[in-house]
């Protein structure tokens, strides 16, 4: 699928399909201005269907033998509520409405006058591209795509075409994350994630370090290896480095939880626990590898990025870790494992210690960590915790620009009492109330206090049963866009600071 920008009127684009978004207060005037030659045909048809241009209202009309032969019209509601996220959703909705029409080209006409050109371009292209994503890898027959061959983003100057490659790189990162998370655990495991990381390194000239079990043991990664010891597939600790072409001004670490399947261990997941979906427990790893694929292509000036994941499975076997076992993490802290189904934080513990050893300017980890976060925020919003207000604001702003839901949660220090152990430095779980908070407090024990750090719990938005806006059902690729936006902002700030002296 190709994209291009054009400031020419819709009627002059020569597309066989046109998709419009109209505001409820002025839809007749907008229709006449956008498609003057067809307005007299379309307005009576819309009135017959009692079209009010309410948000989400959508109608399609076929005109065989005419140009365009298909017109799709969507209501946008009132203009005062039409923000960047609404623009992204409108583009996605109109693109999906064209699916199956086998158009050569679809002209997309949405009101973008209130947006900066680059903001509009991002929302329109990502909205369309990601909504039309379809995973056909595991079907016996691949049906031919009937999606538009080209989508023309009307109202944007053709000079903006040079930015389309950057947007395609971001979409490719999201789609890689979706593919990794959606694939079954007999396809994606620690070894295949190593192959994915190596593919990124080879394609874009990055550095990859892979630690096997012996190397992890030499580094004292007892928490990570306690989880891995029950699996028949060997663990792989992945460290991908994306270096800029010039001098390094900032160094960031992205850490992703990489549990390719989570049985719960001896605290086995039972009915209602969605064990059949526990392939998505590596959603954090999927997100950071997806972001790595994008960032490796973009090569942001002055920014060195370290992507880290401790990949393994959490399985039941004769070698699996016992409930009640005490293990030692690589920073020397001892952990009583009172629940083997709280394994992700154990793998992250050693990954965070490793990341701190790189002395980055900031660390962000992503993990499908707790059901408690899903209960609190649902499946559209991730929760995040950070003791650093500056980093927290950066992530909040990045998520807003990316169109991904993110909500800051409290690091209530008194809740740390719930992690007290009578035998070890701490337990790996606390009481059920505030479970996502105690999980974040646990992770905080493995981060040097002088390094800005944030933990993002993506257990809710990593997966969508029914699909939503730009996300088809299944794996969403959540987190990639936010991470890329954050890295871009950090690189821009570093460049601006340098230029100011």
From Swiss-Prot:
<feature type="binding site">
    <location>
        <position position="281"/>
    </location>
    <ligand>
        <name>Mn(2+) 2</name>
    </ligand>
</feature>
<keyword id="KW-0645">Protease</keyword>
<keyword id="KW-0963">Cytoplasm</keyword>
<dbReference type="InterPro" id="IPR011356">
    <property type="entry name" value="Leucine_aapep/pepB"/>
</dbReference>
<comment type="similarity">
    <text>Belongs to the peptidase M17 family.</text>
</comment>
<keyword id="KW-0031">Aminopeptidase</keyword>
<dbReference type="GO" id="GO:0070006">
    <property type="term" value="F:metalloaminopeptidase activity"/>
</dbReference>
<feature type="binding site">
    <location>
        <position position="262"/>
    </location>
    <ligand>
        <name>Mn(2+) 2</name>
    </ligand>
</feature>
<feature type="active site">
    <location>
        <position position="345"/>
    </location>
</feature>
<keyword id="KW-0464">Manganese</keyword>
<feature type="binding site">
    <location>
        <position position="262"/>
    </location>
    <ligand>
        <name>Mn(2+) 1</name>
    </ligand>
</feature>
<keyword id="KW-0378">Hydrolase</keyword>
<dbReference type="GO" id="GO:0030145">
    <property type="term" value="F:manganese ion binding"/>
</dbReference>
<dbReference type="InterPro" id="IPR000819">
    <property type="entry name" value="Peptidase_M17_C"/>
</dbReference>
<dbReference type="Pfam" id="PF00883">
    <property type="entry name" value="Peptidase_M17"/>
</dbReference>
<feature type="binding site">
    <location>
        <position position="343"/>
    </location>
    <ligand>
        <name>Mn(2+) 1</name>
    </ligand>
</feature>
<protein>
    <recommendedName>
        <fullName>Probable cytosol aminopeptidase</fullName>
        <ecNumber>3.4.11.1</ecNumber>
        <ecNumber>3.4.11.10</ecNumber>
    </recommendedName>
</protein>
<dbReference type="InterPro" id="IPR043472">
    <property type="entry name" value="Macro_dom-like"/>
</dbReference>
<feature type="binding site">
    <location>
        <position position="257"/>
    </location>
    <ligand>
        <name>Mn(2+) 2</name>
    </ligand>
</feature>
<feature type="active site">
    <location>
        <position position="269"/>
    </location>
</feature>
<keyword id="KW-0479">Metal-binding</keyword>
<dbReference type="InterPro" id="IPR008283">
    <property type="entry name" value="Peptidase_M17_N"/>
</dbReference>
<dbReference type="InterPro" id="IPR023042">
    <property type="entry name" value="Peptidase_M17_leu_NH2_pept"/>
</dbReference>
<comment type="function">
    <text>Presumably involved in the processing and regular turnover of intracellular proteins. Catalyzes the removal of unsubstituted N-terminal amino acids from various peptides.</text>
</comment>
<dbReference type="GO" id="GO:0006508">
    <property type="term" value="P:proteolysis"/>
</dbReference>
<feature type="binding site">
    <location>
        <position position="341"/>
    </location>
    <ligand>
        <name>Mn(2+) 1</name>
    </ligand>
</feature>
<dbReference type="Pfam" id="PF02789">
    <property type="entry name" value="Peptidase_M17_N"/>
</dbReference>
<feature type="binding site">
    <location>
        <position position="343"/>
    </location>
    <ligand>
        <name>Mn(2+) 2</name>
    </ligand>
</feature>
<dbReference type="GO" id="GO:0005737">
    <property type="term" value="C:cytoplasm"/>
</dbReference>
